[in-house]
Swiss-Prot record:
Chief place where the protein resides: cytoplasm
Name of the gene: prfA
Residues bearing PTM N5-methylglutamine: Q237
Protein name: Peptide chain release factor 1
GO CC, alphabetical: cytoplasm
GO MF term set: translation release factor activity, codon specific
Amino acid sequence: MKDSIKAKLQSLIERHEEVSALLSEAGIISDQNKFRDLSKEYSHLEPIVKAFKEYTQALEDKQAAYEMLNEKDAELVEMAKEELKLANEAIEKLESELQIFLLPRDPNDDANVFLEIRAGTGGDEASIFSGDLFKMYSKYAEQRGWKIEVISASEGEHGGYKEIISRIYGDGVYSQLKFESGAHRVQRVPATESQGRIHTSACTVAVMPEADEVEGIDINPADIKVDTFRASGAGGQHVNKTDSAIRITHIPTGVVVECQDQRSQHKNRAAAMSMLKSKLLQAEIDKQQKEQSDTRKSLVGSGDRSERIRTYNYPQGRVTDHRINLTLYKLDEVMEGSLDSIIQPLILEHQADLLATMSDE
């Protein structure tokens, strides 16, 4: 392991001890925000410290085993060889883990998200598939213990949605869903197809981290135009009686957001403002990623909504993620929310990309 990496790890261990001491101070305990932030930092540092201690122990075990090789007893020498092998394997594994821990951390990884699914080419079939995607993400969220709420929905004429926007909140939502942005293509025989022909249609998915005050997304009230209108569709009878739905236009950028699924105009406005901040934050993230891609090409993290990232082929029961050439023949499981078999390889690919960048620097 490089001395620079060891030095960085040592500084993190010292910070872990410092944070641990701070968390027991009365002034910190009484300040909810500081206590929450330090608790989050402590939980982030804890596995790093644990892995580094195991790494240090493995180095000591290796040295002890190496010294045992000089013993005259043949049985002890064989034991030393086995212990040396195990120590080397542990060192290699822990070095990889520690390098990943040191990768630049996405500041939005802990954020909740807005999930936007829009029907693209394919007419009614695209709307139906957008409904299927929403169910898939809803089931995945349920499996991970997250909560999901619909912010706005425009239903398709024959089922599904022309567009549906939801908020997903829980632990580490953005870290798991951020690579889902892009064009999702489906190949299947529609229920209305009498000739049994396979149709291709597509939906676009956008995953945006929910912006809060710490993101520094400030909106000048003079830069927005707020309209109220009568809600329609999901939301029940109550919303049809009042002009409770909200549409906010951000004049400088032309970004428009709507919210109609909350029970009051006040709640709809708050949800719409939160979504507007997230869209402006996402625009800034997209800009930064574009600047980075000018110097290096990332297979996974471009987040370009127009980029075709995945194909769902129903006749073959196949799902293919085109960014990492991953093909799985378990479409039914994926559509039931078993997404980790796709998401985790994407995360590993992204980490490998970052590690390669670190090696080049």
